[in-house]
Each structure stands twice: as C-alpha cells, then as structure tokens.
Amino acid sequence: MKVRASVKAMCKDCKNIKRKGIRRIICIQPKHKQRQG
C-alpha cells in the first residue's frame, strides 16, 4: 500500500474508489495499491 498526495491509475486494471472520504486505487496487482493521505 502506497500512501501518496496524488493517486493515479498505473494500469488498465486499476480502479479508483472513494471510501470514507479517502481516495483509493485497487488493482489485481498488489504493487499498484494506493491511497491518498
């Protein structure tokens, strides 16, 4: 899980979701998991 100021989709499988006011990227590749904060 990467915590970044700006989250971007890294591949076509990355999905951008908002959970409890926190933007997250979920993907089939664990390396691509990110959250904004």
UniProtKB/Swiss-Prot annotation:
Alphabetical list of InterPro entries matching this protein: Ribosomal_bL36, Ribosomal_bL36_sp
Pfam families, alphabetized: Ribosomal_L36 (PF00444)
GO terms classed as biological process: translation
GO molecular function: structural constituent of ribosome
Domain of life: Bacteria
Assigned GO CC terms: cytoplasm; ribonucleoprotein complex; ribosome
Alphabetical UniProt keywords: Ribonucleoprotein, Ribosomal protein
NCBIfam families, alphabetized: rpmJ_bact
Family affiliation: Belongs to the bacterial ribosomal protein bL36 family.
Protein name: Large ribosomal subunit protein bL36
Lineage of producing organism: Bacteria, Bacillati, Mycoplasmatota, Mycoplasmoidales, Metamycoplasmataceae
